[in-house]
Each structure stands twice: as C-alpha cells, then as structure tokens.
Amino acid sequence: MMMTVKQESPNSTLNTSEFSSDENLKTNNSEPPKKVSKSSTGKRKYHQKSRNGCSTCKKRRVKCDEQRPVCGNCTKLKLDCGYLHEPLENILNTKKDIANNEPPSKKRKRKVSTVSAASDSESTTQQATPSLTPSPNHSQDIKTQPVIPPTNPLSALSSGLLSAGNLNNLNVAHLVNNLSGLGDLSNLASLGNLASLSNLASLAQLPIDLSNLGSLLDSPAASNIAASFLGSAAATTVPPTTNSEFKESNQRKSQTQMPPQPTVPITSMGAATTTSSHQQANMPSRSKPQPETLQSSIPATTSGSPGMSYPGCPSNSDPFGRSSDKSLPNISPNMSIPANPLSDPLTQGMRSNLNMLDLKLMFHYTSVVANTITGAGISDTNIWNCDIPKLAFEHPFLMHSILAFSATHLSRTEKGLDQCVTCHRGDALRLLREAVLNINADNTDALVASALILIMDSLANASFPSSTSPKSLPASAWIFHVKGAATILTAVWPLTEASRFYKFISVDLGDLGDIINQGVNMNKSKGIDRENSAYYTDLECHDADIADLFPVLLDSPYLITLAYLNKLHKERYKSDFILRIFAFPALLDKQFMGLLMSGDVKAMRIMRSYYKLLRSFTTEMKDKVWFLEGVSQVLPVNVEEYAGGAGGMHMMMDFLGGGPAIVDDNEIDAEITKFDPSGTLTNKLIDTDNLPSVLTSNLDLMQGDNGFMNMK
C-alpha cells in the first residue's frame, strides 16, 4: 500500500505541474507577467534616467516629468520649480538636444565593494562623471566632508572620464571641450593617462577635432600628446580592448601617478557639453602667470636697462616679476608680442604686480606737471600733454626723464621719492648718451624734449653744497645740463618743419646778422671806408655796469656775447625766454670762453651782467614757475668782482654756489663727457662756425681767413 502511494505521488505531482504549466501558457497569452519587486529579488532593476529634470525634483529624489516652465510635481505640490532658476544656456542646450532627437545620457551606478577601505576609496575616485549620484554607502560621508578641490583638476577629470563605465560620446565631449578651458595646461606632459585618449576616442567612435589643443601647448612632450590625439581621432577601427581591461590599465596608471582624491562635481562641464571645439579655440586661455622675467625673452637693445626696481624707494615690486635690488629702472620699447599667449611675457607681466609708483608718476605728469611746463611759456600745450607722453613709450630715455621730473614735482608734497628721482635721472642720462650717437628723424623730437626736461629738473633740484638729499644737485649742475642740451640741439639743428618744436624752440642768432649788417650799411651810407675805419654796431646797452663796452666794434671778441645778451633783454617777456636765458652759458663762443677762462675782466663783467638778469628773472618767476624755486635759492644777491688767478669760469661757478667743489677745469669736461664719450659731438659744441644760426651762412665776414674774427 505504501508503495502504491509513493508511486502515485510523483504522478500526481507531475500531473499537477503539467496542468499548472498549461494554465500558465494560457495566462501568458492573455495577460502580461507581473513585475518582480526589488524586495523579492534584493536588487534594483536598472532603468533609464534623465539629467534634464528640475533641481527641486532632484533634491527630493523623485522622477521629474520635465514639463516646462514648471514641472508637474512642483505644480502639484506648489513648490518652487528649479526650471524657473535655470540658466538660459542650459535651457537652450536642452531645447537643442530635443530638436536633434538626442537620447538622454545613461548613468549607471557602480557596485561598491566592501572588501577593504582601499577599494572604497578607489571606487569613489572612479565616479568622475559630473553630477553623478554618489554611492548610497558614501552619500552621508560626502555631505559631511568639506569639498576639497583637486590639486590638478585636469588629472581628476581625465582619470574619471577614462574609466570603463564612462565611455560614451557625451563624456568624451566633456573631456575634449574642457581641456582648453582648464588653466594648468603645463601639466599635460605629466599626465600619462591622457595618452590613452586615443583609445577612448576610438572606442567611443567619435570624430573629435583636437587641433585647438596644439596651439595651446608649448612643451614638446605636450605637443606630442596632442599629435597622438589627432592621429587617433582620425582612426576608424576599434582596438581590441575590452572595457574591463581598459578600466584595470587606467586604474594602475592613476594609482602610480596621483593619490586617490574625493570626487568633486565640476559644474562647468554641463555647460560645455554642446560647445564646439572651434568656439573653445577662440576663447582666451586662463593660464596662471609664471614667474619668468621679461628680459630673458626680449633681445638686448642699446636703449634697454637691466631692471625696474628702485633701491630704497617705497615702490611696489617689479612690474615684470623681478626683485633685483641692484638693477636700475628699465623701460624697454618696441617689444614684439609672441603669437602663443602662454609664452607671452608681456601678458604674464601685466597680470603680475604692476609698478604702481611709475604709473602714479606718469599720471601725475600728464595731469599736473605738463600744465606747469606750458604755463612757464615753453611751447604749446598739446606737445607736453599729448605728444611727449606718446613719444616716451617709444624712447626710454624720454620716459625716464619724464618720470624723474614728475617725481621731483611730487616730492615737494610727498616724502620718500628722492631715490626714485636719482634712479630715473641716472638712467635718462645714460640712455641719452647712447641715443645722441644715432640721431635720426625719428628720435629728434624725443631728444629735444628730454634735454629740455633735464634742464628744468636740474633747475628744480639745484641746492646748496651742504644739502644731503639724494636728489639734490650742485648749484651749477644746470649749466652742465644746458651744455648737454646744447650739444643735442646743435647736433639735430636745423629742425625740420615736421618737428613738433619747429615753431617753439629757437636758439639761433639769426637776428644778430641783421644787427651787424645794419651797422655795416649805416657806415657805408655815411661814406666811411671799411678798410680804414672801425665799424660799430647798434647794440643797445641795458646795464649801466657795462656801458663802457658800448658801442661795440665789429671785430670785438665780445660782440656775439653782447649781441645775445642784448637779445635776452629785449625778449624778456616772450614765451620761450626761460629757455633762452638758461641756454646763454651753453652758447658762449670759443673766443669769449677763452677770455673768461683766462680771467679777462671785461668778460667777467659781461657774465656778471648776465647773472643779474638771470637772478632778477628767477626771483620774479619763482612763484609762478615751480622748477625755478631751487635755482633761485642758491643764487647769491651780489657777485663780487673777480680778478687774476681765480679764473673766469671759477667765478661763474662761485656765484652759483658751486665754486669750491670744482677745482679743476677738467671736471667740467668730465661732466660733458657723460653726453659725448667719443668726443665727436663736443667739437661742434660752443663753436661759432657751428651754432644753430643763420649768422655764419649770411655773413661773409664770419667766413674764411678774411673774417673779422681774424682781423688784428
């Protein structure tokens, strides 16, 4: 009986199974199978997700129906929909994707292994796709931990996007479009895992234009990487590399090159998804300025100087990143800008610390000092306010002269600029010495302007010999600067009509020829024989102390000096008088200079008459012209008569307050040598036959062996 039951049981079971199977077949034909819940299987079924949902639904972790402008969930619950605060760029990108019928990207969660803490850290690093939902095991930790930006964003980006789970066209586009936007492109050469981008592009079967990367890279290694990218992008075959092998190889490379770092969402990636590579190539690179010097990339010129710092000055750091304490101010003109923005030292220098002191001095010159020069009657307003500053950017010696003069004016109200004045003045003199050896039409106006500015600066800084200020000059320093200016003016004379100073600067003695010719014609009209009678000029005497020297004979060695002095008295209130009166000592002819040096009493009396005119003018104008204050303070009231061994030139130095400091006439030549080391221009200086004048060209008596200068 028992055997019968055991035999029937399988049969009954089989019959029941068959019946059940038949019933299931009928049911399958009529009704769909029931969905298996997650609780029954222990696993969540993967489904398609979209990134285009509103931020409010994302925070609530509910599915968004993506209705715009307000989604259905937010409308139903009366919540503030994230679409209302979405940037316009994201809205346009979403509409563009819908128009192109592009399916939303898929994201898959990675399985988190709980074998060890190291594997947890590794899996966290691999989640590099922006805005990926963190693993449930780490979601709470990420909320509590502060966000630490990676030391190299390019490394973190590449290591994540090269993972096996992120091999899709969207992520490849993310990587490509953001390579040119990342600042630290210099680290491309050190990223070995980027070399696998060729395999990545091939696996994704995405034709990528990486030509814009080649123009952004400087190093040969980085250029080679870009070349490999270009070669791989053109490939059409897929390498036999599985996702698992690719994942393991990139993990090994990432572990050897950089430590694991927490995943940091990069919000800029979403906006860059639909940005074309052509637009990225036109964007300026946001590169970090490198502390390299400008001098190393600019060829050395004759007008350059080694530095831009002022020892002892309260100035900011060097505008091009240098901090040498021994260097002098440097302004290098005509710098060529390289095509590559990353290798452009000018761009990097401009982004580094600027020399605010020099900028302040230039602003002070254009806003204040230039108007004082015009107010003193020295040429036109536009020349000093507009033309001269523009020329200064082309000629460093003029720039240093302007900055020195501006610092002198500013030092009257602010302290701590003495060393700055000295540095700029020294560089201006040094660069002028080089520039006068190569005079041409392009630098003529700059030379004239620089010479005039240095004259005014020396007048402003004239001081007593006991002064200890670094910016102070000897009381007679203006004479040497005038001599240097006369050297320059003589060398560039006559000025062409194209010169800015053609109508305003006049140091010629053209009207002296008219005076002498008038005297000759008057004698001829009276029937006086030239060979048997002495000729006199019609020069007027304006100083009773030298009245006995009038009338002046045509063959008098004092004729030219007295004629120029007479001209000064007549033109005292003309616009350019300030230049004429201070240029007088520099334009003395050689014959009168010889008499003065030998101690000729009449020559010294003429110089004393000039001195009285000079002091009277400076005393009258010192309150109106600020740079006359210095020289007006050092000019004594009375000049006692010198005679004998003191020497005429020493007398000239003494009444200016600088006599005791100069004990040898060779020191004067040494000062002039600063402007003319070779001596080629000195031969032209203070030479009657080479004065910037029409005198010698109009009068035959000044030429040849029969000239009146050679008459005995």
From Swiss-Prot:
Question: Altering residue 643 to T/V: what's the impact?
Answer: Leads to increased ERG11 expression, increased cellular ergosterol, and decreased susceptibility to fluconazole
Region annotation Disordered: where it falls in the sequence: 1-52, 95-150, 236-342
Protein's job: Transcription factor involved in the regulation of ergosterol biosynthetic genes such as ERG2 and ERG11 through direct binding to sterol response elements (SREs) in the promoters. Also binds to its own promoter on 2 cis-acting elements to promote autoregulation. Regulates sterol uptake across the plasma membrane. Acts as a major regulator of ascorbic acid-induced response. Plays a role in the triggering of pyroptosis, an inflammasome-mediated programmed cell death pathway in macrophages, allowing macrophages escaping.
Q: GO biological process: what's one of them? A: positive regulation of transcription by RNA polymerase II
Could you tell me which InterPro entries the record lists for this protein?
Fun_TF (IPR021858), Zn2-C6_fun-type_DNA-bd_sf (IPR036864), Zn2-C6_fungal_TF (IPR052400), Zn2Cys6_DnaBD (IPR001138)
List GO molecular-function terms, semicolon-separated.
DNA binding; DNA-binding transcription factor activity, RNA polymerase II-specific; zinc ion binding
The record's GO CC annotations read: nucleus
> Gene deleted: what happens?
Shows increased susceptibility to the azole drugs ketoconazole, itraconazole, and fluconazole; drugs that act on ergosterol biosynthesis such as terbinafine, fenpropimorph, and lovastatin; as well as malachite green. Leads to lower ergosterol levels. Decreases pyroptosis but has little effect on filamentation in the macrophage.
Annotated membrane-spanning segments are: none
Name of the encoding gene: UPC2
**Which residues does UniProt assign to DNA binding?**
54-81
In this chain, composition skew of type Polar residues spans 1-19, 113-143, 252-306, 326-337
Q: Where in the cell is it found?
A: Nucleus
| Biased amino acid composition, Basic residues | 35-50
Could you share any additional remarks the record makes about this protein? Gain-of-function mutations in UPC2 are more prevalent among clinical isolates than previously thought and make a significant contribution to azole antifungal resistance.
Bridged cysteine pairs (disulfide): none
Record's note on what induces expression: Expression is up-regulated by ergosterol depletion, by azoles, and in anaerobic conditions. Transcript is repressed during co-incubated with macrophages, a condition that induces filamentous growth. Promotes positive auto-regulation through binding to its own promoter.
> Which keywords label this protein?
Activator, DNA-binding, Metal-binding, Nucleus, Transcription, Transcription regulation, Virulence, Zinc
Alphabetical list of Gene3D superfamilies matching this protein: Zn(2)-C6 fungal-type DNA-binding domain (4.10.240.10)
Q: Which Pfam families match?
A: Fungal_trans_2, Zn_clus
Q: What is this protein called?
A: Sterol uptake control protein 2
**Which species does the entry assign this protein to?**
Candida albicans (strain SC5314 / ATCC MYA-2876)
